Amino acid sequence: MEGIFSLDGYKLNKRIYINLQKVTILTAHNDYYTPVIIFDLLDSYFNKKDFSDTFLNKGVFVSLNEKKLNPQDLIVFRLRPTVNLENELKITKKTILGQILNQKFCEKQDIYNKVLFYLQKDIISKLDEELINYGLKSQIVEENIFNFAKLIEIENYIDENPVFFKEQDQYLAKSLIVNLINKLHTKKSKLLLCELPEYALKEDEYKKFLKTLKQSDNIENIIIYTNSENTNTIFRDIYTYHIVKENSVLGFDDYDRILGLLIEKYNYRKSETEITELIINSIFFEREFKQIFENIDENII
């Protein structure tokens, strides 16, 4: 999905517009509140968390290229600043691992038959031997992975040594979740909301993780909220970036006009490529970024 992604309602002060790309990056210039509201809105709207009449009455509106999106149109995943693997790797209907295992389970009908055969032969039949004396008989009501999952416990190992999930390296934890999301096959488009604060990963881990996101071809759209200057070493497309300030999200969808104004400002001494590099390199440094746009149209960015 690509185009103008529009959001309104909930706790937003006004309608915002995002130039949605394969990877879209939000960075805050003195507005660290709006990006979190955007993620909360999308997470709640598409995952129906606390989705009630109260939420609807707040005038929530989500559209792509002026076409309204309904809650069932997308599958939204959210990667928070710190990943709790213990929660993420529970086998339930809402977790990534649960959805993947259920998909694998349903794809192979012979698994059903094998499970039912041994369940009937080794457990149900023996139970019925006791129950028949009382005019009772047992039966399997439903066969699905989530019932069998109660017998499964996920453990964490590093070099064959068990470790607590909370001790797991955040880079490995985040990479694992992204890879699972990437492997999940769905009929609906997937949107990953990724919060990447500066403190969670080391510099080299951060860059490697961004490459993992960039190479996740089976995730249709990824929105990253970060203020780390290391981001622009991996993503060099100007249209990827959005500045969040004063309750607004400002992108570069009108970049031809922006470029024209800046070429005039620099008296044609800088090429289009040089100006683009200048903007991308300064985008995480608010003061430097403002200096580039001094003395031109204040409303442009």
For the regions a language model picked out, list residue spans one by one:
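Structural alpha-beta junctions
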Residues: 44-52, 212-224
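The catalytic "switch" region of P-loop NTPases
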Residues: 215-222, 226-278
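Glycine-rich P-loop/Walker A and Walker A-like loops and their local beta1-loop-alpha1 context
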Residues: 2-76, 80, 84, 88-98, ...
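Conserved helicase/translocase P-loop NTPase motor core
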Residues: 153-192, 197-200, 204-205
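Structural motif
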Residues: 27-31, 193-199, 225-228
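Conserved Walker B catalytic segment
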Residues: 198-219
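Conserved P-loop NTPase mechanochemical-coupling segment
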Residues: 101-172
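Conserved catalytic network of the ASCE P-loop NTPase/AAA+ motor domain
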Residues: 18, 183-186, 214-218
